[in-house]
């Protein structure tokens, strides 16, 4: 089909640049949506990153109330098939058990996304209920990493990252409850920010009852796209359980200035876990770059009982997920998850967590509090802490050890297999602090390797400032002169 841009031109535009062209009436929102749909047709057979396209939103971008004269002005956008609902659209959460599920209303963030001028044209792949580290359920779909389709996408924002990395579109919705924005962003050469609590609403379905470990966000190829997304989509809904805060200056403006020289701690030894030796050498290269930019960097690890923290976080996930599944069962009039519709590890998580006591939950929350206080003290001395985004190389497809298709009979053992590779990102989810994966390195396989910067609560702007400074140091674009094996411009 004819497209409004060449594929090279399309791939060179971020969402902010597309929005500017829309504002100048050089292109229309329908033309951009059609080009994104053509991009899906071009690369999705090799990736399985996009679950569904919404034909009416492609033909008529004003469908469902998208504001075409606001913010992004109709730039095409994918919603992860998990998280805030999209009214009347399928949201099947990567599960046979949820087939046919259609939310009756837009989630609050969905409304903000529409008001920001983003045209929701489809939904992206996720592991079943977002639980595991890769979207690989042959009964539903198997998503692939566009940098090398023999490798996993990681997760749970699997399809979002694969789509943006492959050039389908420049910006996509993502969620993060332990690293699900940052980890796949790190393996796809993207920017992935997990914001501080109180930035993106989780209304109407969720509140503090979940421990508030999960939040919303996006993945992008440019820092300014992430900054603009936050500026446009942040804010709380009526009846929130906590105040939702705003920065004193829009991030889109703030990122144009370099941060002041920062004190950055660096580590790869996180309790019982440490990074692959190649990752350590890449971490050392990042340290050198930061020092060249004028930052003070020292090898220091936060004084935290990581073993206790991981145990508490595991309790949180197990108890949260068990109650989530139990509510679904009650709505469907079932007493147990059907084994032919729900993946085996997810059934075992439900079994283990269903009868967790209030005392166990209290102990978990007590650890959350003590770890948060300890980390807060650490950030009195250090502006940030730097690690790799994950500790071990991206696995090849089909590595069942990390999948909810695993036959591991021990749920705790399965979670600790995850922590061995996803070691560094859960801390920010537990404490409600901010973390960002920045595409600064490569794995021995050639896949991208993100570098993960964490900081104190409400210091998200400084993370973005540093990311923008690093982006400028790379010549204005991360990972220049290279692109994935599967890409719209190939």
Residue ranges, per PLM feature:
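Gly/Ser-rich catalytic/binding loops embedded in alpha/beta enzyme cores
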Residues: 2-177, 288, 293, 298, ...
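Short helix-loop capping/hinge segments that flank enzyme active sites or metal/cofactor-binding pockets
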Residues: 2-6, 72-95, 256-267, 318-376, ...
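Short, well-ordered beta-strand elements within core beta-sheets of diverse protein domains
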Residues: 18-24, 78, 97-101, 214-221, ...
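Acyltransferase
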Residues: 26-34, 63, 250, 277-302, ...
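Short, solvent-exposed turn/loop segments enriched in Gly/Ser/Thr/Pro and often Arg
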Residues: 124-132, 304-307, 390-391
